[in-house]
Curated annotation (Swiss-Prot):
GO biological process terms on file: microtubule depolymerization; mitotic nuclear membrane disassembly; negative regulation of axon extension involved in regeneration; negative regulation of axon regeneration; negative regulation of mitotic spindle elongation; regulation of ARF protein signal transduction; regulation of microtubule cytoskeleton organization; regulation of mitotic centrosome separation
Gene Ontology molecular function: any one: phospholipid binding
Physiological role: Guanine nucleotide exchange factor for arf-6. Involved in response to injury in mechanosensory neurons. Inhibits axon regrowth via microtubule dynamics, possibly by inducing axonal microtubule catastrophes. Limits microtubule growth near the cellular cortex of early embryonic cells.
Stretches with biased composition (Polar residues): 213-223, 255-269, 361-380, 782-799
Native source species: Caenorhabditis elegans
GO CC annotations on file: cell cortex; microtubule minus-end; plasma membrane
Presence of the UniProt keyword Transport in the record: no
Source organism phylogeny: Eukaryota, Metazoa, Ecdysozoa, Nematoda, Chromadorea
Regions of compositional bias (Basic and acidic residues) in chain numbering: 107-119, 154-165
Biased composition (Acidic residues): 140-149
Domain SEC7: 356-532
CDD domains on file: PH_EFA6, Sec7
Region of interest: Disordered: 92-123, 137-168, 208-291, 326-383, 782-818
Annotated protein name in UniProt: Exchange factor for Arf-6
Gene it is expressed from: efa-6
Comp. bias intervals (Low complexity): 326-347
């Protein structure tokens, strides 16, 4: 209705050829609707000005007897000094007529007739903007946006020939907010529009107003699509578009029209809409947030405050904060190449000591222009919000892998928390490093500068070491091998036409880094990369041709757990003599299968594979599982009661299965027992809760899940300790229920089974503790070696490649040189 009334009134008045004569009796008429108050007469009397006071902020008074010079700044800027308020003389009449800018967006569309008569017959319009976005118009931007300023007084014709004495933008400090007035508009009436927005349309508590008593308030950039509520500062602006399922803040129509080159949060369609605020000077709502369009057409929010709200950027070394217990000083050496290149997230603003005005660079990505959210990162709500955003990023919901990489590279406290939650979603336990790298790069695309890429690779390395602490000794080893795999991938599958790298060259190059890896593992990794290249560009798969994000927001079906022998970590291997004693269900093995046979065993993840020799035959994935045994909740221990053979150890698997193995010496026996127990302790899922019964001494045993556990080692250790305490209570209850005069076989068998469970979990605890202690000792030894002056002198004398040779920067340069 407001638009129809405004359009009809303006079209009717646009047909008037000449200005009305001064001797005509003055009358006033208004067309009032929801958010538009249109005056059909240029001269408004004091009576209607008083009626208009209902639309003005509280405290504004209109008195016709007061001379315009005697009005206060707030009253004069409110636009209440109408021509009919003082009729004492022509000079006073001229002074009392205040020019009012009128939005000409509709008149411009009517053609030359409206352009010709817009200065004489366009009505005075005061648009009360309630929800329109707030813009910041510079004096130099008026010509670019093709806007006109129409003054509604006849005295303006006389002043058109006078040049403007001051075309610069001036700052007017008000008691409540900070208003920017452009002399090109020549309208103090816009100030009252802004004040009415703050006081009448927005109900903000007084505690949340940021008073600006200085002439240079600080401006910090917030993320797009931010809307403030009446409860204080806006909620977290970080990646609101990803969280569209919870908040509904993302318009799907605007999303589908964005170009592929721009970010999915770019308001391209929104900028095309004709809103009254496009012709205003500056309006600031109660929250103090203002929108403005930059040169690239992207819009951002500006937060006006005199307080220093500089975001506290995280440390450049992310691993020191996330995995502090897993790091060693060697990381500083491997970061030397990254520090040489310009940082992707260097601070682009320079703030003064007293909080001067500063703006971020217009070329920076909108994904990186996020401030620290109002939600505390240490609160439960902040962690919950970060976990939800991380889940959306992990599922590529309304975003691409390119945008995920930009989001993870942001440098603020809340983004750091999102990064931690995002990494926790990757479960690399029992997964070989090349398969884990493929999974990580399928969701995160390596882009940007070398420092940003290397930071993502180091974050991946830290997470892989967290999930597999028994494979590598330090973070540097994981990071070195990761960069080496990327170098190998670019050499084997890159556009270079030279000689391809061989397995011997690959092993030799890694040996120069100072890190020691098993030769068989390097051969396996080389063959895997050679047969299947690592894809480094996945953003095109996650978006449609017109740039809109593909429909990945639907709930993905739950994946069925599969074991791929070719992508699982191999912990140990060797020839063994095998004999089945009991089947997986606890029954005795048939006589024909109980003989001793030689096999080549491979311990990969939670599965023990058996082959005829060390070169497995090319079979399918499921065919290899036929000659395999699952080791979840298994226990390996020497079998001194077996007298027929020496160096024999027993493996008891879940639900009663038992297998005997014979080694060639005592050392191999201890190695096999240690590796099998570690795998079972680290990756066996916790048992399901016990059933509720009135007789706990006869209750069935809990079920043992087959799915591997993806919790860290420390969490598994605490779980096993709690299980031992629970078993002690159960053993005590069963012992009290046994009668010495009339023993019950069921209760006795249960007591034996509980005692075995206690011994199994106690063995798990000891194995995990030894593993953690060995890792700490290795880290301490590495630190001592690095801090020894003799060691430093020896390293300087050796003409070998430094340990950070295979960082990502050198890897890329090395790939280009081939």
């Amino acid at each position: 209705m407001a638009k129809v009334a405004s359009s009809g009134a303006e079209e009717a008045l646009a047909t008037i050829d000449g200005a009305p004569r001064r001797n005509v009796k003055k009358s006033e008429a208004f067309v009032m609707s929801g958010d538009v108050l249109i005056s059909l007469n240029r001269n408004v009397s004091s009576t209607y000005a008083k009626l208009l006071g209902d639309q003005l902020p509280p405290g504004t008074t209109v008195a016709s007897s007061i001379h315009p010079h005697q009005l206060s700044r707030a009253t004069a800027s409110a636009g209440v000094s109408f021509p009919s308020m003082n009729r004492n003389g022509a000079a006073a009449q001229k002074l009392s007529r205040l020019p009012v800018p009128v939005s000409t967006s509709q008149i411009e569309r009517r053609g030359s007739l409206a352009r010709k008569t817009s200065e004489e017959s366009s009505p005075t319009a005061i648009r009360m903007l309630k929800t329109a976005p707030i813009e910041r118009m510079e004096s130099t931007d008026v010509e670019e946006s093709e806007e006109e300023t129409v003054m509604m007084t006849t005295d303006e014709k006389e002043n058109q020939k006078k040049p403007n004495e001051n075309d610069d933008e001036v700052m007017v400090v008000d008691e409540e907010q900070f208003i920017v007035v452009s002399n090109d508009m020549k309208s103090p009436n816009e100030e009252i529009v802004a004040k009415s927005l703050r006081s009448a349309m927005f109900t903000m508590p007084t505690d949340n107003h940021h008073h600006s008593y200085n002439s240079s308030p600080q401006i910090s950039t917030l993320s797009p699509h931010l809307r403030s509520n009446g409860d204080g500062p806006s909620r977290s602006p970080v990646y609101d578009d990803v969280d569209d399922d919870l908040n509904g803040s993302l318009d799907a129509k605007d999303m589908s029209n964005n170009s592929h080159q721009q970010s999915f949060r770019s308001p391209e369609n929104y900028s095309e809409k004709d809103t009254p605020s496009k012709h205003s000077v500056v309006t600031i709502d109660g929250s103090g947030v203002s929108n403005h369009y930059d040169q690239d057409g992207m819009f951002s929010h500006v937060y006006y405050s005199t307080q220093d709200t500089t975001p506290k950027h995280g440390s450049p070394s992310l691993r020191k904060q996330i995995f502090e217990s897993r790091t060693t000083p060697n990381t500083a050496a491997s970061n030397s190449s990254a520090s040489a290149s310009p940082s992707l997230h260097a601070t682009s603003e320079s703030r003064g000591a007293t909080g001067g005005v500063s703006l971020r660079s217009a070329e920076s990505s909108n994904l990186n222009q996020t401030a620290v959210p109002s939600t505390s990162t240490n609160s439960v709500g902040g962690e919950r919000e970060a976990a939800q955003i991380a889940r959306n990023l992990y599922e590529l919901k309304n975003c691409t892998s390119t945008q995920v990489a930009d989001r993870l590279n942001e440098q603020n406290e809340f983004s750091f928390l999102i990064l931690v939650k995002y990494l926790e979603l990757f479960q690399f336990s029992t997964t070989r490093i090349d398969a884990a790298l493929r999974e990580f790069l399928s969701r995160v695309e390596l882009r940007g500068e070398s420092s940003a890429r290397e930071r993502l690779l180091r974050v991946f390395s830290a997470r892989y070491l967290e999930c597999n602490p028994a494979i590598f000794d330090s973070l540097d080893e994981v990071h070195t091998l990761t960069c080496a795999l990327l170098l190998l991938n670019s050499d084997l599958h890159g556009p270079n036409m030279g000689k391809k790298m061989t397995a011997r060259d690959f092993i030799t190059n890694i040996a120069h880094t100072g890190c020691t890896f098993k030769r068989e593992m390097l051969k396996t990794l080389f063959q895997s990369i050679k047969d299947n290249a690592i894809s480094l560009q996945n953003s095109a798969k996650n978006s449609t041709a017109n740039g809109s994000v593909a429909s990945t927001s639907r709930r993905q079906p739950q994946q069925i757990y599969e074991v791929d022998p070719d992508s699982v970590v191999e912990y140990y291997s060797g020839f063994l003599m095998r004999k089945y004693v009991r089947e997986t269900d606890g029954g005795k093995t048939p006589f024909g299968r109980r003989s001793w046979r030689m096999v080549y065993a491979r311990l990969r993840g939670l599965v023990l594979y058996f082959d005829t020799d060390e070169h497995p035959k090319a079979t399918s994935r499921y065919a290899s599982l036929e000659n395999a045994v699952s080791l979840h909740h298994a226990l390996a221990e020497p079998a001194p009661d077996y007298k027929k053979k020496s160096f024999v150890f027993r493996v008891r698997i879940a639900h009663g299965g038992e297998i005997l193995f014979q080694t060639s010496n005592q050392k191999e026996l201890q190695e096999w027992c240690e590796k099998i127990n570690f795998v079972a302790a680290a990756f066996s899922s916790p048992t399901l809760p016990l059933p509720v019964t009135s007789k706990p001494e006869t209750a069935p045993m809990p079920r043992l899940p087959r799915i591997p556990c993806l919790a860290p080692i420390t969490k598994q250790l605490s779980t096993h300790e709690a299980r031992v305490a629970e078993l002690n209570e159960m053993i005590e209850i069963v012992s009290q229920s046994v009668s010495p005069n009339q023993p019950q076989q069921l209760i006795t068998d249960r007591w034996v089974l509980l005692s075995f469970e206690k011994r199994r979990y106690s063995t798990y605890i000891n194995v995990l503790r030894r593993s953690l202690e060995a890792r700490k000792a290795s880290s301490a030894t590495t630190m001592n070696i690095m801090m020894t002056p003799t060691r430093r002198q020896q390293q300087n004398q050796k003409p070998v490649v430094s340990e950070d040779r295979l960082s990502y920067t050198d890897a890329v340069n090395g790939a280009a040189a081939h």
